[in-house]
Amino acid sequence: MTYVDTSVLAAYYCPEPLSNKAQQALQREDLLAISWLVETEFLSMLARKVRTREIRAAEGLRVLAVFQAHLEQGIYQRLALEREHFAKAREWLATFTVPLQTLDALHLAVAAMQGCPILTADAALAKACARIGITAHLIS
């Protein structure tokens, strides 16, 4: 199972420079996982693209419908955030040495505690993964 970061989903569902690479990377994986946090971040990203007129509202609704259909089809296994994920994120952040934002620390905690590598288009996140011993596959 591979944990898919929001940055990859953004490139997969919306036209971006990394869209082709995101598609190829997702097709190579057998079992894809996201957390409820990824789903929320994806919707936030989509809303931002509509608000900033990067895409039209109709396109945003189309993308959302496709993503929702994929969720309903079980393309992604949804992972819940649990108390232990917050504790693990807190542990990493308390070292003061791992350059993670709050939500990224939570993503990595979910992936780490599931024993999943993470697929990301975020170079800083991939670098943080290396610091804490999580396998990251960076698309760039």
Tell me the role of every PLM-derived stretch:
Residues M1, E84-A87, L108, A112-S140:
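Acidic, PIN/NYN-like endoribonuclease modules and their adjacent C-terminal/linker elements
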Residues I34, A80, T102-A105, L119-T120:
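Short beta-strand scaffold positions
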